């Protein structure tokens, strides 16, 4: 059982053909990834699910079997399960499942292997390798495990269930629906130079070098000794980087020791193992995007820098730090808005949160404008939005149709800014938004960001990155409405809903609210809970950080001079992220002054 590394803290659940759970909570070995044995009784197609974490990410994987025996659970077996059943992840483990003939499973297996052919060859595997039961050693980074390391697998539902495959060591996207494949992935000729066991060894050294302040600053074995001479590190994405191994290491060590950043001392925790990101090969030394995530002593995760990279020099892998001078990020987010004090229809909305620092780059030019575009399945570049410098704030703001309309304006000469740090790009709720999401599934998640030094978006920026950069979107936006509502959303307990509706606090009095919830399915790592008196959550009455597996939050604060009435608008916002970085945001609202049936 693996996703390139053995799942940590994982358990297995098995459903019989009727949808009845015949095994739950069966532990998975954290060292070998093995599970079972589990006895199957009856005939038909059994569904097997394992959920846990890989490095800093939550992961659920699935498999189908008619006969039992050895069954791996990996992203590849998940792809087979989705294509053979015709069900997306939101529906796969719900209800009864009609028997799937062995011939159908075999045909889907062949379809997937055909799409994976270049990656199978790179991993040294035969074209007919058994993805369901072939030899697999989690964490070995060779053979089947290398395949899991180097191929990105996304699952979802459009008009049909689909699988999207991308190569981290090459280019292209293979898009599969039951019985059909569009596009293809390729592996770079220099892919063999990406020595993953050696990259793993670098991170083992980095884990040791960041274990304590003394280890971090050690002149012989400390962080600087593991960084490239051209390494870059920043206090935050909106500030210029410090360059060189010594200065970059100092910045990171000071951040970990609480001297820089938000003042939190992180030593006493640990750096988490990385999972491989997209690699740049062919021209120059191999460079791969990596995660640099530190888990503090309380179990909370801190991402140190964005778009971090490691580079393989003649002497081996070293940490490069910031891949880009302009450390832009893009994250897909889905918001579920639910009224909890009375009956009303739920609503969902999709966003791309594109954060582009309003930075002064090398040479002194200031970033004033950026044009963001994606590719469609035919390779055409499609503009999504412009972002401009608002004159304040840390990030460029969306160039909108008007000051009261967040619809993006695609004309840099016509439009308006709606304030500082307006990074959210809304996707339309209908076909237009679906088309944008569909392009990410069929043509890959790369976003091109063209950079300009003038507000007219006409003069290319001169900096270390050149006039444009490419970043990957974290999280695949769900396409079908059922896929949006079928994400692993938290469901507040009835008592939590009632308590939010009844919550009232006198001026200058203490507020206490302790909501609890369950999740509709596994695969969401929580990170924050907020209690707010406005829909934008611009004012926060209370907030708290959450552990990934949280099922409750303790919110408390002392109110100011304005009382909170029981019939006032109140918002509980819970946020978390899925395996591929998709952010899920539940906005649970109470507005008892409005009639039932109306949205807040």
Where are the regions a protein language model picked out?
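Signal that preferentially marks extracellular ectodomain short beta-strand elements
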Residues: 276-279, 405-442, 551-566
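Beta-strand-rich modules
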Residues: 449-451, 563-582
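Extracellular Ig-like/FN3 beta-sandwich strand-entry sites
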Residues: 43-45, 442-446, 565-571
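Feature for extracytoplasmic/surface-facing segments of secreted or surface-associated proteins
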Residues: 1-306, 313-326, 330-335, 526, ...
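Short beta-strand elements
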Residues: 68, 327-328, 461-487, 580-600
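Aromatic/hydrophobic beta-strand junction motif of beta-rich domains
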Residues: 1-3, 346-364, 493-531
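Short, compositionally biased P/S/T/A/G/V-rich stretches that sit at domain boundaries
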Residues: 237, 268-270, 318-351, 467-511
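Extended low-complexity, serine/threonine- and proline-enriched intrinsically disordered segments
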Residues: 10-14, 357-407, 449, 512-544, ...
